[in-house]
Amino acid sequence: MSDSRAAAPAETRHSRIAALAKIGTCRTPSFSPDGAFAAFVSDLSGTPQVWQVSAVGGWPDQVTAFDDPVIAVRWSPKGDWLAVSVAPGGGLNQAIFVVRPDGSGLRRLTEEGPVTNELGPWSRDGRFLAITSNRRDPASLDCYTVEVGKWDWRPLTASPGDAAVYDFLPDAARAVVHRSPHRGDADLFLVERQTMRETLLTPHAGPANIRNARVSGQGDRVFFPSNLDREFCALCAIRLDPAGMPGPVEFVRDHPGADLDDLDVSRDGQRAALLWNAEGKSELEIVDLPSGDLVVRPELPAEIAMDPTFSPDGRSLALTCTGAAAPVDIWSLEIETAAWRSLTRSPHAGVALGDLVRPELVRFPAADNLPLSAWLYLPRDFERPGPTVLSFHGGPEGQERPYFSYLYQALVEAGIAVLAPNVRGSAGFGKTFVHLDDGPLRVGAVRDILSCVGYATGTSIADPRRIGIMGGSYGGYMTMAGLTEFPSDFAAGADYFGIVNFETFFAHCEPWMAAISKVEYGDPETQRDLLRGLSPIHKIDRVTAATLVLHGANDTNVPVVEAEQIVASLRARNVPVEYVLFPDEGHGFVKERNRIQAAQATVDWFSKYLNSKTPGALQ
């Protein structure tokens, strides 16, 4: 590491970190019915709100001004309402509102209180809005429809599991519902709106991942990504007869070795936009559905694309795009010419995007020779071996991909390398790989931490005396697992809202989340010994590394009791620990001032404890 960077005044370093953390995001486009405008969510004002912009680009207008962050927005097919979900205090108990496109007429549709609500789609005639909620049973997420004007709630489903409406049939008499009994398995159902009668669309044996489904323009086919009877998600379809009875699942299109992440189907049902995940990077295909032929495979503006959304006339496609050196922005593709237009331009004052570091995809074996991979971010004048931080993603069934990360860029600017791995249990590498950490197999994922250390030191990237570890949510669990299982390998750690005690996690998290997490982690009623053995809190006496703990007070995904346990235990043992609690955040830090504080605290922590060649030594 460059000594000049290591010794840079905190004030100078903090101003650079603030500039990186202030880089805005614009995401989740939703077109007006005439295609003239797009609504989207952006933190241009400091907290995510609803904005709208001309479909040809230009200066956006802010629509909402909530104190709390907006999660999603959907424009009604009639054009008269925007449906908006808001996270009070940043937590999971979202509130659903409707508001006029000009910002007037704000109306709350959900009740106050600790109820989980999620925004679903509009029916095609704009009469009904779908909402997922656990208002009936805290341990289950049910689907409801709300009729515009009456604003009354009508149940669509009332069964155990995590359910969500993916789409309505054209006449709004039936809806396609996704239901997951537990993580890693799901089904699609066709549900009659009036009677709640369900027809299973996807009978199968064994686990299957089913993602965002879309109904064809005529209502006779349902398209969706799935790994039913295969390793990777492909484009699947089910034909519906006039009575709604389904035919067998058909495989329409695949991409060997890649997962179909998301899709959209044009309003006339003629074309599909397919987003593939190929080794962590996105690839876009526009496909003619009647023939199955490829229309265009354009180069994307950045490494990652999300939220594919056709314009009402089907001539253009809006996407959220981002990359290691590209902020999160919305782009529009003119399909016939394959020309891209930027609809938004997230500000990046004080940051030259061309100076940001792009990662390299590296591969290495686990102890049992299972292939692992990671994204490696190296400072431009990095002196090997040097200070290195391992960063673990959340999930567990998440995936490290080359998204824009202000924290990674801040660390490499401070002269610290970042190795961000995908260990067993990560998504994007096939069905078998993602289930290799289920229940008692989790010990294998924890052992993979040591394989990551071995790669970093064996390639002379990391100084073995100056290695840190960090991660958020499940990545926070992996952080604390690394610090307890391999204490001599780490000089410092940063635990972002991570699980440290599976017993208290199950006791205090959202009941519906606890219900679907038993297969992934273990059943607290029948596998208590397993959960205790996997919980870092029961090995806390092994920790010697300086530990930074960051959490949101309103987190009901991983409740703050997890942070409180680890902080109290480390303080009692005189292990260096710092606790940063955000009173206005939930599971993740979205407000600008909090992003800045968290990033500054993290970079300061690793700069302090990894700059010395003696593990854990104070500067």
PLM features per residue range, with description:
Residues F382-G386, S391-F429:
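Short substrate-entry loop that stabilizes the transition state in hydrolases
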Residues L235, I330, F364, A374, ...:
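Conserved hydrophobic/aromatic pocket- or pore-lining residues that grip, position, or stack substrates
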Residues R380, G394-G395, S473, A553:
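Residue-level signal for short, function-critical loop segments
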Residues K22-V41, D67-S85, I96, E112-T132, ...:
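Conserved beta-propeller blade repeats
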Residues V423-Q619:
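Active-site-proximal cap/loop segments of hydrolase catalytic domains
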Residues S342-F382:
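N-terminal cap/lid segment of alpha/beta-hydrolase-fold proteins
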